[in-house]
Every structure is written in C-alpha cells, then in structure tokens.
Amino acid sequence: MVRISGFCCAMSLAERQAALLVLADGSVFHGYACGAAGTVIGEVVFNTGMTGYQEVLTDPSYCGQIVSFTYPELGNTGVNPEDEESARPQVSGLIARNVARRHSNWRADRSLPDYLQQHNIVGIYGIDTRALTQHLRSTGAMNGGISTTILDPEELWAEVKAAPSMEGLNLVDQVTTDRPYEWQTPTSQTWEFIEGPTTESLTVVAIDFGVKRNILRRLASYGCRVIVVPADTPIEEILRHEPDGVFLSNGPGDPATVKNGISTAQALLQTGLPLFGICLGHQILGLALGAQTFKLKFGHRGLNHPCGLSQQVEITSQNHGFAIAADSLGPDVEVTHLNLNDRTVAGLRHRHLPVFSVQYHPEASPGPHDSDYLFEQFVALMRDRQPTPVA
C-alpha cells in the first residue's frame, strides 16, 4: 500500500479526529474528519472548479461518488439556502485539502462542516489533494472509502474492493422524483443574466433522471410551464400532459443501464416533439438514436472546459464520467460540439427531427453562462411547432 499524509490548519490539533481514505488500488491517505462520523464507499472523482462547492455537493449527478476538490480552500463562503441544486447533498463523501470552520458571506446561514454534519455526510480533509488528483488522472477514477471509525487500512480496503463499479450501475432510481410536480420558480432577478422572454405559453415535460434545480429555473425563466415527471414515466402519461417539448435531464450512473429512459426516448423520437437533453439526458438520447457510450478514464468535472466545433468556442461547466462514442453515431445524427480538451462528443442534433443535446451544463450553477442560448434554442423549436393563431 502507498501511504500519503498531509496537513491542515482548519482546526487545532486537539480538535482533530483522524480519518482515512483508501482507494481500490490500495493507495492510502491519512487526514482528519470533517462532517459526520462513519464509513462511506463510492467512486472517487475530482472536480477542478474554484467555486461552487455547494452546488456540486447537491448535484444529483454526483450520487454514488466521493468528490475531491482540487481547489485547496473549501467552505470560506459557508452554505446558503439559495444555492442548493436539490433538496439535500447527493455526494457519498467529500475530500478537501482544507475546510474552513469559520465562513464569511452575507448569504451564508451556516458553516460547511455544520452542513455536512447536519446531512450525515462523511468527509476527510488535510490530505494532499494534488497528489490524489494526479494519481486519479494517471490511473483513472476508482472506488474508494472514507472512514472515521475504520482506521485499519487493510480492513477499509477490503470493504472498498467489495463495492460495485460505477460501470454498469443504475443510480437514477435513487435521485428521481417519486411523483409528478409542476416547477414554477424562475431564476431570481438578483442573478438573472439574460433578457429572455417571460411568457411563451409552452409546456415542457422534464423527465427527471436527477435534475438540477437551475435547469428548471432556466426553463421557467423562458416562460415555460414545466412539469417534472419520474424517470420511469410511460410515454402515454408524458403525452397526457400535452407537451410542446420534452426535456431529458442530467443524472448519475451508467447511461446504458437506464433502459426505461432509453425506450421512452425512442418512443418520443417517433412523435416529432422537440427534445432537449443535458448530460445523462444527452447520453440517453444518443443511445436511443443507436449510438454507444463508454466510460471515460477520469471524467470531466469542472467549470472551464472548452467546447465547440469550428469558429465558436464556449467555456462550459461539466460533470460526467461517460461519453458517446463518435464512431457509433448514425448518418442522421450530426455532432455539433466537441470537448476541445480530448475531442469527445459534447453536443449533437438530429438532421431531420427537432432533437438536440449537449454533454455539458448550459444552466451552469456553478460555472459560466456561455451556453444559456441553448434554452432559447429549445424554446424556438417548440414555438416553431405551435400552430399559428388565427387572426
């Protein structure tokens, strides 16, 4: 086993509680507990964003994962009610170099350690996150475990090795809504960054594979009536809402395992309705169109990924561990965006149907707003399909 330790100045020596991180390949990192006591197992991944830790922690796409933040200072701005992307934290665990016990921000109502404790999230700080990131970049994302109660590396390693791989894992059932509901809250005017239409009289059914709240806010900000439905909702029930378009949301796990979602997308393609997919929804659309997906070595998780194809580049927020295989796309599907770091498919559209999707997150939260126009594009497709009113 490789043993790596680190340091941290968030708490005094007397207040620190030992914690342990063990990876599936036997690497061991010694640090200190942050949050709840206990043991958690999950896929260890890294996020390179310098801001937005609260949005990351509450993003349902991180379900089943232990997130290591490469930015060394976490928690300086505390936690607030407005930046939640779901009703609770979704990560399995948190890894940080340093976690601030005291916060300073006018919107914050509690510290990050208190928030983790409140929601029973196990975390570890004080480790060399740079070394961890370089290791994951070289060897690939892998399962790992954090524990404040099992401090024997061999014992924790045995539990990690027994955990299932993310490849082949369907986690959508853990994050989808259990019943339909209508979302009505637009982006707060305090943070509104685009002059968009506010009344469109358009109904969007959003299939919830683990949807982020800011996606729903952006759709509502463009005047859409948004009906959110569970991931396994049959096509007949979706059509009963008489949608002008259907949105396929982000979410966690291996897209190839979401069989209900893929079959629903295939049925929706036959209706001619405008379809828009983001992240997992993009992958599900690709699979419905006959493409294949594959697992990336360490994924794309951060706020500064350049995407484009020819003359225009967008800086995007990303969070995914799978991608669509470009050589598996049929002749009716056009690649609209590539991730310019590794040339993987970042966007596609159907050549004949009002269907498009992107691998990244145009709603940001956190991240840049370069791609917000995609919501306007979706609205335009729905508007063009509506019958022209008789004068």
Curated annotation (Swiss-Prot):
Reaction(s) the record says it catalyses: hydrogencarbonate + L-glutamine + 2 ATP + H2O = carbamoyl phosphate + L-glutamate + 2 ADP + phosphate + 2 H(+)
UniProt GO MF annotations: ATP binding; carbamoyl-phosphate synthase (glutamine-hydrolyzing) activity; glutaminase activity
Ranges of residues in domain Glutamine amidotransferase type-1: 203-388
EC number(s) given by UniProt: 6.3.5.5
Record Gene3D superfamilies: 3.40.50.880, Carbamoyl-phosphate synthase small subunit, N-terminal domain
Coiled-coil portions: none
A matching Pfam family: GATase
Active site residues according to the UniProt entry: 279 (nucleophile), 361, 363
Signal peptide as annotated in the record: none
Record InterPro entries: Anth_synth/Amidotransfase, CarbamoylP_synth_ssu, CarbamoylP_synth_ssu_N, CarbP_synth_ssu_N_sf, Class_I_gatase-like, CPSase_GATase1, GATASE
UniProt keyword annotations, A-Z: Amino-acid biosynthesis, Arginine biosynthesis, ATP-binding, Glutamine amidotransferase, Ligase, Nucleotide-binding, Pyrimidine biosynthesis
Pathway the protein acts in: Amino-acid biosynthesis; L-arginine biosynthesis; carbamoyl phosphate from bicarbonate: step 1/1; Pyrimidine metabolism; UMP biosynthesis via de novo pathway; (S)-dihydroorotate from bicarbonate: step 1/3
Listed CDD domains: GATase1_CPSase (cd01744)
GO biological process: 'de novo' pyrimidine nucleobase biosynthetic process; 'de novo' UMP biosynthetic process; glutamine metabolic process; L-arginine biosynthetic process
Chain intervals for the UniProt region annotation (CPSase): 1-199
Positions bound to L-glutamine: 61, 251, 253, 280, 283, 319, 321-322
Enzyme class: ligase
Family: Belongs to the CarA family.
Function in brief: Small subunit of the glutamine-dependent carbamoyl phosphate synthetase (CPSase). CPSase catalyzes the formation of carbamoyl phosphate from the ammonia moiety of glutamine, carbonate, and phosphate donated by ATP, constituting the first step of 2 biosynthetic pathways, one leading to arginine and/or urea and the other to pyrimidine nucleotides. The small subunit (glutamine amidotransferase) binds and cleaves glutamine to supply the large subunit with the substrate ammonia.
PANTHER family linked to this entry: CARBAMOYL-PHOSPHATE SYNTHASE SMALL CHAIN (PTHR43418:SF7), MULTIFUNCTIONAL TRYPTOPHAN BIOSYNTHESIS PROTEIN-RELATED (PTHR43418)
Subunit and interaction comment: Composed of two chains; the small (or glutamine) chain promotes the hydrolysis of glutamine to ammonia, which is used by the large (or ammonia) chain to synthesize carbamoyl phosphate. Tetramer of heterodimers (alpha,beta)4.
Record-given protein name: Carbamoyl phosphate synthase small chain
The gene coding this protein: carA
